[in-house]
Amino acid sequence: MSQQLQQAVEIAYSSTAEPALKKQALEYVQNVKAGAGAAEVFVGYLGDAGTSDVGRFVALQALSELAGEGGPARLAFLKDSAMRALRGETGGVWGAPEYVRNKTAEWVSRLFYAMYGEVNGNMWNSFFEDVAQATGVAGLRGSAAVEYNAAGLDAFLRVCAAINSEIGDQTFVRSKDAQVKNNSLKDAMRVQDVATLTSIWRHALEAMRQDVQRQDVAVLVLQCIGSFISWIDINLIVNSEYISTIYAYLNYPKTRIACAQCLCEILSKKMKPGDKLQLLGMLSLTDKVLQLGDVEVEVHEQLAKLTSSVGLELSVILEQCHDDSSSAGSCSIANSADHQIIHQVAPLVLKFMNHEYDSVTQQTFPFISHYLTFLKRLFALGGKPGSAVALNSKKLPLDDDHRQFLTSLIIVCMNKMKFDETCSYDDEDEVEEFVETVRSKLKVFQDNIAVINPAIYMENISKHIKSLLLGNSWRDLELAIYQMHNFAESIRNNLFGLNKSAISQSQPAQLMTTFMQDILDNSAIFQSSNPLIQISFFELIVRHYNFISHTGKNDISILSIFCTPFSMFNDSEKVRLRSWYLFSRLIKVTKPRLDDESLSQLLSKLAPLLAVKLLPNVANDSEIDTTFDNQLYIFEGVGILIGAKAKEEYSILDGVLSPLFADLESCIAAPVKSPEIVVQAHHILMAIGTIARGVHAGLVPENQLNNPQVNAALVHKSLIEKFSNIAEVILVTFSYFNKYETIRDATRFSFARLTPILKNDIIPFSSRLISIFLESDLKTIEMNDFLGFLGQMVHTFHADDNCYQLFNNLFTPVIKKVFDLVAQVEQEGSLASGANTAPAVSKVANGKNVVITDSFRDKVQLKKAYYSFLQSFVSNNVTSLLLTTANRNILPLILSDLLSYTPAEIHETSSMKLSLNVLINFVKFFGTGRCADFKDRNANTFEPLEGLSEFFITKVVPLVFEIPFKPEYEFNIDDGSCLVLAADLSRLLKALYDVNGDPANNASLKYLTEAYFPQVQFPQELSMEFIQTLATADEKAFEKYFVSFIKRMRS
């Protein structure tokens, strides 16, 4: 059997074997595992002298799995086998590769998990004694001066580590039952064996201290102590002799990292402040680290982490004693802890923080962050007035020691913020990583110092920025700009604790203004070709433009900087595109009122960027023209400049639009509408619409954009004429390209941007626009957007008679277009199902047994847009449009749709809610055949629609009862969505009752009592109760009754 297993293992783990053969080999090994005598087979295979290391690993893997599955007899057999393996009698595991030794330890730990402690019936309570004897380390319980087996100690320690991974490792999420068992095993170990284990570890460390050959094993001991410390009695480890023994291993290169990690784990153990302070006093860490001198970076990382851990624990002691400042003992402990931080830990932390490798620097951040947070509670003079920091600070005078610490810290932060010599500015990943992991954290520390003592911050950052601006390196200039940004943000966020009214004239603000003046006059900045400097410069200018306004630089001089190769004409695409956005952003924020001459000169400089050029490989609709998307920012910025200019004369707009119009004419004249031509036409329409949006934004204050009176007062007649011409151009273009979806999108976009300027003057153009859209072959998503566009028009122009007439003429064609598209979507869904294709399907989230296809989802989205369109007539008091002579014939189609639903539609809650809301409002406003909306100016213009009242009654009443009670609708009143639906149905029935007047002659009540209830054989007593409640209860009370009624009837 062993020979067959060996062959199977060799094949299964071979890199050259055929896949089919490897599969057979793996199946053979699995079958052996599942066999009745698997334990005996794999123990025999493990002990076979011919078994390879990989074979031993497979055998041990199988035995580990079997240890968790067998009964007492199998466990006893496996226990004996494991002991023989640990004694080196079988399996050859002592001298095996590390992965085999680890797997052996895992096997033994699984036996521990299955047999140790009361939770396992005390099947193997002598586990650790037996393992210690088997591995030859039992003598280390009492003394270091004994002979021991180094390979056996290695095995013993790996077993200990495996056991901790099994029961003590907190990185794994375990079930509640597993956690209970783990806790029971740890309790048993604490009582019986932990003291023995800690003795063996300590004596092993003492025995190996001078044995360079065994330092690898010492690493295992230190790892065991570090991993067990979280759940064993701290007093077993924390005593001067034990800590000294561990501490000594900082002296040896091979053990430094493991020793530092072990000490960090010990330090993180929860203890009373006094006890923790005593432990920290044992370490004399500062002296030890200084003695080590130059070591590897990895060692420096661990030493930095260890130092930071010491500082963090001292800082925690400070915080705890500060919160319990009533006792003299707490004050004494706090003073001692702070003294250690300032005089011992801080100098070392700052040394590590200033290390050339960022990985070392980062280890110090937890301590620095915590300690600064504590210092804010004592000393903070800044912080926004009324903020938690300002209110909670004791505002104690800053002593010399803490002043020196804060000064040294901010200097180190500033030094470490600079990109080092190895960093290349064009390595975006490296730059981003440094900013996110190091620089951003240092900025927070810098800000905290500003809050604690604004004077220290001001003095040092001003020196730093001045020094950097004099530097020649791109690293100096980049950091200067970054620090200016930080300084400006500290003013914006009022880290200095100034009164709001005093900020603009404060010393920090004046200093920032000086810095802005300096950077605008700094020739080295503008001579730099570094993208980081170029982008960060303009980010600074735009973000903190308010400081420039006091420098004497006018708007046109700043905007002119953008119109140079340093910015918008830069060779670097990244800089160029970002500058386009920032140019627009600056204009949007400042809205400069330029005179015509200055604006004309600026537009002349920008002219090359105002031409729409089609880049190669973007003719395909699926391609994204990133350059053009960013170019739109320029068009918007130019529009704002034109809208905000000093004079109300807009001939300058022609200079921007004429080249675009000429290009559109070329597109229209092209005999073949190639993809390139279509894309160019789309881009030009988008540019025109974006310019229009910019003009409006420049003309009207941002907080008044939707105020009709303000808009009307600010829009000059000449501008309306310009925009009317734009509308005409767009319509002509659209008429030639209306079969292209991208053109339809761009047309709708542009038209919507003309509306705020043209107002009612856009209605004649809109009539033609809508007609062309209705002639187009629209996709579902386009129709959704188009209906939204129409709804917005109803909202904007509902009081305009021309708009009323427009929709009177076009309402019926729009409705027909919607239902034609609904029918098309349904047909596509049927064809897909009939052809046995696989449309995407998913169960609806409400748990109903309804399958939703893509076509059904498209239909639902279209219906929602359609219902919102109908609701716009209700919301804007023009429901009379549905009763005009032109639209009466389409009304039956509309109402039929609102009064009939499939089971799948019933469970689309959002769509149903919209639909029923429309139906409720229709019942309220023309449920009697006459328009009852007193706000509708045309309500009395038309004759009543005969028979409409009876139609509503005979259709609404059955609908209200069929939806909750018909089996095919699967209506579950306990489901939240169905509960919402029931509430809407109750409102519908109540609205029907209300519009039919006096209870004594109410046609809806009469239909219920004389026709519907008898027809469905409704009990007489319940009928009277229902009628009575409907007639007397208000809407809310009837809703509550109707829900309980459904529950009663379905129970």
Curated annotation (Swiss-Prot):
Gene3D superfamilies, A to Z: Leucine-rich Repeat Variant
Keywords for this protein: Cytoplasm, Nucleus, RNA-binding, Transport, tRNA processing, tRNA-binding
GO cellular component annotations of the record: cytoplasm; nuclear matrix; nuclear pore
Protein's cellular compartments: Nucleus; Cytoplasm
Transmembrane parts of this sequence: none
Similarity field: Belongs to the exportin family.
Role description: tRNA nucleus export receptor which facilitates tRNA translocation across the nuclear pore complex. Involved in pre-tRNA splicing, probably by affecting the interaction of pre-tRNA with splicing endonuclease.
This protein's name: Exportin-T
Naturally occurring in which organism (per UniProt): Eremothecium gossypii (strain ATCC 10895 / CBS 109.51 / FGSC 9923 / NRRL Y-1056)
